[in-house]
Regions:
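A composition-driven surface/loop motif
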Residues: 1-144
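C-terminal outer-membrane/trafficking sorting elements
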Residues: 144-191
Length: 191
């Protein structure tokens, strides 16, 4: 697809589907798949997403891949690195691995959630479960490790400073230790 264009970006708008007999998408240079939409790649016999000597970043989007190989590099070369950043990814490679033949899998603000216990094995250059190459569906999902936005319509009698357990505190803001509090219905962090 992009043999001569490095830093290639696929921006997803809406729901997109590519179905092919061979590879659904081939990326030969450093590439990013991003956007508010989603992408469904299905290969009837070969690669869903072929990272041929390329590093690929899946950034803040949703990607669904199925094929004989799900998401795969060509030979697991050092340049074939898959980065998943705050994205939802489903990959299934019924013949040769769901996520395979890559030198590294970098997960930023996300984790492999299905199957439980699955992990990237650098020696096998693939996502495995109990040391076995996975050919069934692998799911990578965004993780949250903090409080997002707290929205509340706080009546006057409920205003004040609360801890995360919902207990109203009697100390003033300046007297509180460092931590996360809800002040008049708004999340505040005190350092």
């Amino acid at each position: 697809m992009n043999k001569t264009v490095s830093d290639f970006t696929v921006k997803l708008i809406g729901n997109n589907t590519v179905t092919a007999d061979l590879a659904s998408m081939v990326l030969n240079q450093t590439s990013t798949i991003t956007g508010d939409g989603s992408l469904h790649l299905t290969s009837k016999r070969f690669f869903g997403l072929d990272m041929e000597s390329a590093s690929v970043t899946i950034d803040n989007t949703s990607l669904f891949v199925k094929g004989g190989y799900g998401i795969a590099g060509y030979i697991g070369a050092k340049s074939e690195v898959l980065t998943v950043r705050n994205s939802y990814v489903e990959a299934e490679g019924s013949g040769s691995g769901s996520i395979s033949l890559i030198s590294d899998l970098i997960l930023e603000d996300c984790a492999i959630t299905q199957p439980v216990g699955a992990e990237f094995d650098a020696d096998q250059k693939a996502v495995v479960l109990n040391g076995e190459l996975l050919k069934s569906k692998v799911v990578i999902e965004p993780i949250t490790n903090s409080i997002g936005t707290v929205t509340a319509d706080v009546p006057a009698r409920k205003q004040g400073i609360y801890n995360l357990n919902g207990v109203k505190l009697t100390l003033q803001w300046n007297d509180l230790p460092a931590g996360i509090y809800i002040v008049d219905g708004v999340k505040r962090v005190k350092n």
